[in-house]
């Protein structure tokens, strides 16, 4: 009876397996492209694999078709049909396939390259990209260069990666790196289950996929579809000559295993002839620093006697125990993954050992193994909405540019012609900020798709053949500050909303060379009555000339009056008091601008003296731009009403005609950046001084956030804006971008993004929502600068942004790789670790994960006390918060504390 039950069980397994194979043979979700196959040829089914291949012509807009010239007669290799033709790319630096995929689904992506001397030229070498990220280098010039499936690719190679797309579109790009021509024979995508090849980050680049047999590999030993329902390519691993092959005709139950292992793989193995021997295998990888993920597939394929036991331990690289005791399941597939920060040896060699335990009577073995390298894809793709919109625009105008392939914005060296993009953090999707389609040969009306580029700041459509009206939606694009429509055939009136924005200095609008008028009523001036109006043109022109002359005279008169006294009408909101200086007085203070101290985006800063004994720094606005005046006014208004020991003091200002000047107290030790990585970094700051500067800056910022009413957000915290007096006391400066923020139930201000690259809060950058936590992020970046003396952005590092770089280094747990070596280890490690943890919490990508400035200020004071106690004194450090520090206010400008 037991035998009958076993037969029934095995029969059910076979039925299930056959059903699985039939279901899988429909190749649902498979993408199989025969690259170079003409568009007009019909799809076909390859005889040897049963796979349905079709032309790649609908998935790429460039390249030419070629056919291999030779097959390897010596080895008897006969390439399957998809690998006999190819697509090569003699033009363009980057050529990309664009494929529609299922977002969030894991795909096996395979690219096959069979050279076959198709062009009778030099074998090529080029790069392969997955979206905007480097995948691998294809090197057919090196005969030993990583040809994995050599038995069936004698004149080529294949690359595989398991990748989960983050959108419904996937770009696979071939990038020219030298003088040779990139090409590809086949591109194959296979959807996989999401519970098999998993990673917390990155994708899995295939190194090897083996099953173990004693015979040397042959063409027939390659196993793929239809045996493998996922079309994985399995190559035989030539086992030790002293091993013995075993196999079974009894079906192995693979239904309990998510990997859907083929019967042709899991029913075979090779074991040591001596039961006490260790089962070992070794292989090499190109980069020893890569994390390696290994999947070991087992099944007991021998009918064991009651007295038999097969038990062994699994060791990685001779010393890391993966399993102390493991026994394969009898006629059932099982997988043991090794994927926790596993690395090979320093020489790039990896090893796996299966060692028999004392209680085992049978030798160990492994049926099959897959080895992957972790491929970190750090650069995010351009915002999906922007990409979709841009492709709609491309289709509307039939734009054909050689480099309009792949991701529009990244990598930066391949940015599409006519675009500028924001690309501040690799972890944040770039956004399209500028379009310059001048002289693109555009025809038709201005497409409404443009309005969906909601981060667009500049739009240049000049010198095309555009017709129709100027659309109203341009005035509703909140960030748009420049529009050039010159040199087209646009007609009708310009929307009044756009004209109002231009009049108020909110936008630059260029529209000459069109049939446009400035009066909305001109659109109705058609029909018979229009001839009478034309008779009035000479009269109106004469009247207009007289009007212009009068207007010019009035304007000259106004300008002369403005030179005599400052304007008050347009600047009435600025506080006017005794600290207002004339430009002549400024010239006296600076001794005719004799001694420049530095130059920045605002203008030049000069040294000066007030009352012959008080040194000051005089900042002169370089030109009277609208934005410059706005920042000037914001800074004066703020500094006239708030006073704090850690905020720079405004001595006075000048607002006279075109002359805008700010006069500050003189900070003799410059700014913090100069002492960390600039001209003064040769005399490094001690850890104590660094902590004091950080704590004092935090106190000034805390005061802005909770000591003012309305509370203020600085928006431009950076080491260059932290000034140091003769005692190295820190004072926060440059308040031109500062904004008040709401209290009560409102949590943020929606505003255009402003700030400095590297210091800018990524959440604010992404959402346009400004909160006090945006300042906290910027301060966290400064604190990392203070600890490391590293630049905020450095493209030569493993991670370009300082926050990502420190996080990367922290995974090794060695603080010495992070701390500024110029401190020579002279610091209290506990205070430094606490400051480092605080900095990393400040630069959390999510504002909800950041502390507020009061918490930051208090923790820095504790760090400072710890450091001072190590040195045996407090060194004049006061642990009070910034609100308890000595402050002074004019009687009419006392801010309310919340």
UniProtKB/Swiss-Prot annotation:
Ranges facing Cytoplasmic side: 557-898
LRR repeat windows: 455-477, 479-501, 505-526
InterPro entries in the cross-refs: Kinase-like_dom_sf, Leu-rich_rpt, LRR_dom_sf, Malectin-like_Carb-bd_dom, Prot_kinase_dom, Protein_kinase_ATP_BS, Ser-Thr/Tyr_kinase_cat_dom, Ser/Thr_kinase_AS
Composition-biased stretches (Basic and acidic residues): 868-881
Residues with the Phosphothreonine modification: 582, 751
Signal peptide stretch: 1-24
Phosphoserine PTM positions: 750
EC number: 2.7.11.1
Membrane topology listed for this record: Single-pass type I membrane protein
Keywords (A to Z) from UniProt: ATP-binding, Glycoprotein, Kinase, Leucine-rich repeat, Membrane, Nucleotide-binding, Phosphoprotein, Receptor, Repeat, Serine/threonine-protein kinase, Signal, Transferase, Transmembrane, Transmembrane helix
Enzyme class, broadest EC rank: transferase
The family this protein is said to belong to: Belongs to the protein kinase superfamily. Ser/Thr protein kinase family.
Name of the protein: Probable LRR receptor-like serine/threonine-protein kinase At4g20450
């Amino acid at each position: 009876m037991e035998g009958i039950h076993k037969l029934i069980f095995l029969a059910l397994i076979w039925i299930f397996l056959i059903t699985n194979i039939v279901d899988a043979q429909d190749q649902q979700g498979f993408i199989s492209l025969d690259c170079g196959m003409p568009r007009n040829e019909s799809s076909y089914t390859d005889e040897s694999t049963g796979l349905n291949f079709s032309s790649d012509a609908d998935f790429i807009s460039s390249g030419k078709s070629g056919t291999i010239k030779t097959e390897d007669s010596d080895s008897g290799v006969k390439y399957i049909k998809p690998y006999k033709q190819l697509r090569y790319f003699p033009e363009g630096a980057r050529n990309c396939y664009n494929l529609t995929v299922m977002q969030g689904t894991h795909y096996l992506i395979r690219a096959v390259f069979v050279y076959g001397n198709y062009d009778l030229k030099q074998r090529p070498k080029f790069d392969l990209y997955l979206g905007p990220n480097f995948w691998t280098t294809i090197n057919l010039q090196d005969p030993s260069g990583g040809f994995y499936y050599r038995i069936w690719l004698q004149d080529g190679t294949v690359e595989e990666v398991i990748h989960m797309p983050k959108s419904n579109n996937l770009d696979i790009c071939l990038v020219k790196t030298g003088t040779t021509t990139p090409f590809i024979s086949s591109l194959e995508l296979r959807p996989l289950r999401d519970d098999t090849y998993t990673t917390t980050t990155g994708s899995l680049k295939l190194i090897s996929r083996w099953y173990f047999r004693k015979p040397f590999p042959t063409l027939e030993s390659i196993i793929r579809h239809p045996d493998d329902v996922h079309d994985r390519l399995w190559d035989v691993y030539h086992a030790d000559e002293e091993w013995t092959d075993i196999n079974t005709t009894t079906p192995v139950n693979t239904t309990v295993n998510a990997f859907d292992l083929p019967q042709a793989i899991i029913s075979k193995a090779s074991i040591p002839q001596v039961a006490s021997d260790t089962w070992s295998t070794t292989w090499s990888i190109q980069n020893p620093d890569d994390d390696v993920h290994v999947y070991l597939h087992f099944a007991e394929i021998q009918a064991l006697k009651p007295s038999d036991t097969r038990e062994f331990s699994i060791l990685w690289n001779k010393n890391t125990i993966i399993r102390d005791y493991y026994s394969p399941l009898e006629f059932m597939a099982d997988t043991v993954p090794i994927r926790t920060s596993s690395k090979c040896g320093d020489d790039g060699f990896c090893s796996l050992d299966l060692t028999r335990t004392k209680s085992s009577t049978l030798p160990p073995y492994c049926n099959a193994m897959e080895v992957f390298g972790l491929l970190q894809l750090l650069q995010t793709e351009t915002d999906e909405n922007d990409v979709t919109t841009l492709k709609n625009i491309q289709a509307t105008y039939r734009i054909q540019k050689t480099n309009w392939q792949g991701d529009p914005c990244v990598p930066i060296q391949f940015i599409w012609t006519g675009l500028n993009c924001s690309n501040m953090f690799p972890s944040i999707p770039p956004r399209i900020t500028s379009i310059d389609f001048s002289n693109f040969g555009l025809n038709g009306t201005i497409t409404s798709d443009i309005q969906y580029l909601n981060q667009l700041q500049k739009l240049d459509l000049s010198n095309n053949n555009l017709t129709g009206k100027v659309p109203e939606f341009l005035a509703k694009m909140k960030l748009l500050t420049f529009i050039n429509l010159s040199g087209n055939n646009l007609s009708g009136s310009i929307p009044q909303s756009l004209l109002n924005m231009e009049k108020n200095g909110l936008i630059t609008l260029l529209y000459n060379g069109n049939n446009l008028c400035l009066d909305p009523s001109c659109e109705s001036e058609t029909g018979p009555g229009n001839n009478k109006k034309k008779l009035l043109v000479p009269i109106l022109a004469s009247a207009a000339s007289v009007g212009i002359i009068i207007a010019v005279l009035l304007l000259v008169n106004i300008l002369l009056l403005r030179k005599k006294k400052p304007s008050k009408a347009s600047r009435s909101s600025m506080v006017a008091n005794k600290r207002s200086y004339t430009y002549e007085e400024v010239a006296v203070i600076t001794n005719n601008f004799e001694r420049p101290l530095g130059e920045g985006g605002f203008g030049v800063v000069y040294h000066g003296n007030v009352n012959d004994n008080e040194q000051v720094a005089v900042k002169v606005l370089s030109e009277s731009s609208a934005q410059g005046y706005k920042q000037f006014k914001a800074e004066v208004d703020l500094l006239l009403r708030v006073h704090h020991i850690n905020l720079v003091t405004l001595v006075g200002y000048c607002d006279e005609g075109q002359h805008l000047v700010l006069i500050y107290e003189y900070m003799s030790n410059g700014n913090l950046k100069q002492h960390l990585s600039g001209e003064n970094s040769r005399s490094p700051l001690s850890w104590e001084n660094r902590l004091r500067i950080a704590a004092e800056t935090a106190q000034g910022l805390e005061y802005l956030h909770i000591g003012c009413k309305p509370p203020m957000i600085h928006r431009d915290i950076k080491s260059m804006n932290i000034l140091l007096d003769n005692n190295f006391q820190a004072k926060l400066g440059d308040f031109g971008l500062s904004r008040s923020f709401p209290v009560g139930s409102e949590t943020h201000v929606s505003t255009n993004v402003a700030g400095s690259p590297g210091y800018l809060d990524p959440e604010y950058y992404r959402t346009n929502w400004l909160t006090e936590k945006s300042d906290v992020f910027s301060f966290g970046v400064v604190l990392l600068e203070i600890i490391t003396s590293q630049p905020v952005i450095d493209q030569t590092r493993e991670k370009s942004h300082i926050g990502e770089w420190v996080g990367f280094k922290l995974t090794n747990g060695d603080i010495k790789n992070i701390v500024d070596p110029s401190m020579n280890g002279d610091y209290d490690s506990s205070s430094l670790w606490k400051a480092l943890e605080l900095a990393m919490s400040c630069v959390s990508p999510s504002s909800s994960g950041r502390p507020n400035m009061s918490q930051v200020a208090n923790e820095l004071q504790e760090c400072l006390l710890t450091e001072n106690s190590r040195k045996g004194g407090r060194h004049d450090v006061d642990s009070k918060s910034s609100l308890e520090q000595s402050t002074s206010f004019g009687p009419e400008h006392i801010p309310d504390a919340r």
